Amino acid sequence: SRVKILSSLKIDETRVPQDGRFRTFAFGRDIDFRVSTFPTPVGEKVAIRVLDPTVGLKGVENLGLVGHAAQMIEEAIKKPFGMILVTGPTGSGKTTTLYALLQELNNVETNVLSLEDPVEYFVEGLNQSQVRPEIGYDFVSGLRQIVRQDPDVIMVGEIRDGETAKLAVQAALTGHIVLSTLHTNNSIGVVPRLIDMGVEPFLLPSSLNLMLSQRLVR
């Protein structure tokens, strides 16, 4: 119950999963904790993810990318518009890579906006927004509104459906840098996946700047 109170969850609701987060000051810094509850026949199971900015937030130079891969990323983020898509299995560090790219692009002259589910790390200078599908605020509705905020860089936590994919491509074609993740087995799988989602094939060459597939070596 204490964890649910800290996370602003309903303590009397044990029948459905709930998600929340709380922040505490420890070791001289603020540390966020993401909480997920899951109902079982013998009680609720709780998973807590520690989000320590000093550990989770990395620069591009700390991602372990070297040689041609590092050069391709450096060239891609210098382009004035286009999409950079990161693929890989769950837990492979896709979000870490996105945050590294965002920090590289983040400066006082650049309007950076993000749509996340949820916001993992709060970064100074970024305009971060958490989608809430339960009230109709999802990636699709968020993307429609975000382009009216005069963004230079748009980060979408994940492209999950065809409508989000089409809006992201349109944003990339209209002068924005778009960063996102996609679930495919490899980087070459991005193209057929987007086409399968309903994106017109002729739009991809002019909208895709970089497709990056990664794995986490443990």
Description of each model-found segment:
Residues 1-218:
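Short, flexible helix-loop junctions that flank or precede catalytic/ligand sites
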